[in-house]
């Protein structure tokens, strides 16, 4: 299986755009770039790799694996913090390592779980890029289009999965 290159310039642009989606308007730090490149370089995904990236993006904002570690994202309430969160994250990692799931399915599952207190968006987009690369698609020619990105994530919980499959499929095959 070949792999699409993740050049430093692409990493810089990707992390800068991912930060901008979160309202972080600055150049990526060396630590963010190194951690993102390390995640993308993995041949298989692990919870540890996601945790390492998240710790760079949002230090001190842990996995929500304890009761009371709850978050709210606009009107969306992810599952409450509990030991179950870590098991659910392992399931998402299993999806990521499987050819039976598309990158968008893994990304949406991650975002709906929202496993960390902070940093979920940027880690989720890095997971999406990793999955695209490992499925031999090219995520770096596909801008996130912030408005479409958030609109689609919010519609996911209100729509049939198949209604969303087609737009994402076209992104992955262009």
Describe the role of every protein-language-model region.
Residues 1-174:
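FIC/Doc superfamily catalytic core
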């Amino acid at each position: 299986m070949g792999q699409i290159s993740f050049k430093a310039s692409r990493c810089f642009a990707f992390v800068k755009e991912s930060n901008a989606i979160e309202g972080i308007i600055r150049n990526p730090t060396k630590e963010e770039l190194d951690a993102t490149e390390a995640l993308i370089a993995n041949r298989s995904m692990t919870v540890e790799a996601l945790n390492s990236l998240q710790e760079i993006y949002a230090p001190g904002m842990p996995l929500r694996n304890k009761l009371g570690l709850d978050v709210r994202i606009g009107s969306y309430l992810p599952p409450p913090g509990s030991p179950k969160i870590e098991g659910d994250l392992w399931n998402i990692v299993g999806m990521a390592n499987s050819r039976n799931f598309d990158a968008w399915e893994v990304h949406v599952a991650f975002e709906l779980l929202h496993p960390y207190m902070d940093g979920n968006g940027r880690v989720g987009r890095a997971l999406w890029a990793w999955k695209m690369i490992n499925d031999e698609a090219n995520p770096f020619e596909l801008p996130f289009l912030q408005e479409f990105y958030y609109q689609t994530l919010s519609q996911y919980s209100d729509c049939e999965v198949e209604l969303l499959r087609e737009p994402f499929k076209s992104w992955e095959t262009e």
